[in-house]
Curated annotation (Swiss-Prot):
Annotated segments matching region Disordered: 1-29
Protein's name in the database: Protein G1-like1
Matching PANTHER family: PROTEIN G1-LIKE1 (PTHR31165:SF122), PROTEIN G1-LIKE2 (PTHR31165)
Species, as recorded: Oryza sativa subsp. indica
GO cellular component: nucleus
Amino acid sequence: MDMIGMASPAESPGGGGTARPSRYESQKRRDWQTFGQYLRNHRPPLELSRCSGAHVLEFLRYLDQFGKTKVHAHGCPFFGHPSPPAPCPCPLRQAWGSLDALVGRLRAAFEEHGGRPESNPFGARAVRLYLRDIRDTQSKARGIAYEKKRRKRAAASHTKQKQQQQQLVEQAAAAAEAHAAGCMMPLSVFN
């Protein structure tokens, strides 16, 4: 099997069970197939092993023509307005969030299909810079601020870990005091 080909059910994780793949996995498979088709239709045809960040950028620009997000040009009277009151001739583009998610899925698919992380064209610096530029441009043109989402769950687990560490420190201090005083402390203190 080449890196673009799909694994047979026997090769896939789980051994071909009846469980349906998640929405993310299905989308990742479709994205990978679309990118493989793009490589095959490229003139001259392009092998994945020779694919670079520049080819990924070419693919993202190709996808831009199928976008559904209105991105106002600098000369448009609605530039910077999130909800324009009337239609305008500005082009439809791929939204930054869609491109960012697509690159993330393709980056994962590349490595799942045998690619080395250090040679992953979807993680190239040029691709990251392109996505950042698209985000900034669309943010200004559409009047929408893109802010990084914070992980609430991670913060809650971090607080819990801190509390557990503090309890262990207090228990160790109590054990040291008891030992210094010469009395016995039950082992249940450490559970």
